[in-house]
């Protein structure tokens, strides 16, 4: 059986949540972002592991329903927030029926909220009001944010003023200071007529880089999954653990003669007799086709781990690695990303970010859950 697999580590998710909480004041709550099927990790595996988060954030109604189904199966009730809000009046009404919190970022959503209100004791009676402080993606601009807030509070709603850092991964970027200043000013203005208004500004990068801006809620995303949220420190330096291991196996081994080429377009050729292995994964599984300088982890017959170069072109179902001088057997497991190499390292080689690699994995690899990592071996 082809053994390409995605292994999710719930213990790593739980550990990362604790690391995030250790950065916060005790009163600051964590909204665990589980949109896009929990960044490719799977709602069913992720939500139970993150059950000690204060709530869950999703992008759309179908994701909210999936999270609710898992929570219902655990007999647990937690806030679920639609961070893009309702996409129609009908969705707004469904959100009220299921008590999903909603973000409001444009006038039409505001109109729905004013015309169709939930009960005062529902969680969804607290609106996550989005303020565009500089990302220019979603949210009310400077000239509308206060009037939108006033309309909602006059109607009896509670508010969480929300914005999103554009450059929090780069602590020195000048836009950060401008966004913080705008957010603080708007929050102060709103609290004049609605003193109980809460604030939520920080994503994963903001949690680590702007500890004085945590306010009442943080929205933790990529850090929960063990990937690096900031530019100047690795995930390991932040004590984050990878929550996903992508693995395959050695499916063939060949000894090339000098001058033999491999793969499509013959991009790599042996300069002398050379041993290579074929690995059972490709872009049909979601592994990136272009990975300049990427390595994989392979264990030799003595149990020692080695980082081996990918050579030639990644195809739909397989690619080749350089194992010259190593004693490697067919069916040996190959780690594409996990503890080493990390997904951040692979993303850099692919010219993208870890988020995309997590989310682009296809349904072909089998999925499994493992509470602990395999015993670690030192690299040779």
Where are these regions (language model features)?
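Active-site anion/phosphate-binding pocket segments in diverse small-molecule metabolic enzymes
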Residues: 2-10, 14, 63-65, 86-89, ...
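Terminal domain-start leader segments
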Residues: 23-25
């Amino acid at each position: 059986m082809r053994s390409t697999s995605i292994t999710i580590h719930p213990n790593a998710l739980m550990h990362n949540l604790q690391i995030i909480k250790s950065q916060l004041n005790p009163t600051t709550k964590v909204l665990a972002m589980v949109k896009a099927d929990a960044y490719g990790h799977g709602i069913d595996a992720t939500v139970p592991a993150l059950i000690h988060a204060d709530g869950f954030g999703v992008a759309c109604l179908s994701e909210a329903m999936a999270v609710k189904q898992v929570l219902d199966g655990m007999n647990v009730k937690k806030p679920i927030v639609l961070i893009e809000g309702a996409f129609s009046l009908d969705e707004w009404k469904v959100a009220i029926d299921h008590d999903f919190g909603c973000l409001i970022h444009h006038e039409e959503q505001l109109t729905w909220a004013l015309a169709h209100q939930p009960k005062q004791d529902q969680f969804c009676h607290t609106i996550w009001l989005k303020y565009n402080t500089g990302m220019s993606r979603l949210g009310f601009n400077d000239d509308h944010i206060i009037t939108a807030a006033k309309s909602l509070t006059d109607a009896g709603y509670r508010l969480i003023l929300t914005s999103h850092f554009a450059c929090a991964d780069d602590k020195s970027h000048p836009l950060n200071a401008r966004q913080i200043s705008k957010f603080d000013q708007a929050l102060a203005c709103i609290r004049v007529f609605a003193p109980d208004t809460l604030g939520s500004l920080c994503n994963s990068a903001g949690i680590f880089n702007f500890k004085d801006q945590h306010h009442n809620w943080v929205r933790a995303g990529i850090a929960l999954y063990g990937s690096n949220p900031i530019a100047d420190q690795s995930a390991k330096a932040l004590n984050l653990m990878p929550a996903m291991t992508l693995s395959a196996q050695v499916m063939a081994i060949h000894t090339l003669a000098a001058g033999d080429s491999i793969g499509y377009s013959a991009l790599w050729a042996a300069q002398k007799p050379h041993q290579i292995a074929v690995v059972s994964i490709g872009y049909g599984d979601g592994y990136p086709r272009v990975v300049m300088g990427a390595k994989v982890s392979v264990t030799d017959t003595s149990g020692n781990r080695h980082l081996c170069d990918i050579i030639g072109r990644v195809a739909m179902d397989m690619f080749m690695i350089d194992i010259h001088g190593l004693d490697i057997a067919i069916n040996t497991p190959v780690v594409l990303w996990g503890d080493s190499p990390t997904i951040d390292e692979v993303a850099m080689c692919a010219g993208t970010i870890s988020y995309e690699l997590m989310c682009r994995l296809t349904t072909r690899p089998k999925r499994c859950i493992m509470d602990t990592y395999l015993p670690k071996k030192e690299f040779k």
